[in-house]
Amino acid sequence: MSWKARNWVFLGDSLTEGVGSTRVSHVTELARQLRTKSNGAVHEFRLRRIEANVFRQIDFNVAGFMNIDGELVNAGGKQGSCGDLSLWNLACEGQTIVSDFAWLPLITALKPELVVVFRGALESIIRPAALREHTWPWWVPASWRGYAAMDPRCYFSDRWWRKAKQAGVDAFKQKARLKLLKQCKGQPLMDVDQLISHESSLLKSLRVRGARVVIVGLLPVSDDRFPGSPEHFKNVNARLRDVAEREGAEFFDWAAQLAQKGRHEDLFYRDSFHPNAAGARALAEILQTHLCRDLAAIGHG
């Protein structure tokens, strides 16, 4: 049996990179789940671009984390392995789809058989119009004027004094954000036409590299938390489906299956936007079923 390494690449924002210090995400969970069913080793690599001036003595512009399969035998792979499967999580919080183009040289070198693109959530969530128009009222502090500065916190600290402060500040921010959205119709960070234009260009670049490309749809959010976003997400998903078909990629609406895994509040953090650990596991299960209906087909059966 010939040995062949396999690479899967995942592009996206914080919903793919993960939340918190451990950055648990559906990619991490997918690696864990595949390991239980695979004869080959399954590794997870997480990379993100960083500012070069973070390090004073050495010139770095990429930071990462390696989650190597602990079941390796004599550093040569699991018994019966026909090649390792590496999952490359290249997502980064706070970065729009424009940042994905910087990874194309690495993707070319990796020659992945699969690229999963989870884009559009960061760009499409409805936020106060003042963010794009730069017309903030005087009473909004400067530190609250960032694109996500007033978004609901995903969670609070376990320490009561920190939790009390965080909860208090978050309550003021949510009151202010919802007031702004009520006073003036909110806007997404990026217009849907611009998003789809970038998506189309990205898909063209990925397809010429010979990879199977899967676009996953946006996940539902609470209209109470983000007024106007659920309806806008439906429109964005329809456009994502169209561009996927036009560019020869696949569109996978995993949100429909996620609803069968549990209640929304049990699968997402309190912001209703980021999947929690349970949500990440559920998404990984859904993705695994869709991507690997026959694990033997990827040499890991």
What does each of the following model-derived ranges do?
Residues 3, 74-86, 95-277, 281-301:
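Alpha-helical cap/lid subdomain in secreted, periplasmic
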Residues 1-91, 101-116:
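Serine-esterase "nucleophile elbow" of acetyl-processing enzymes
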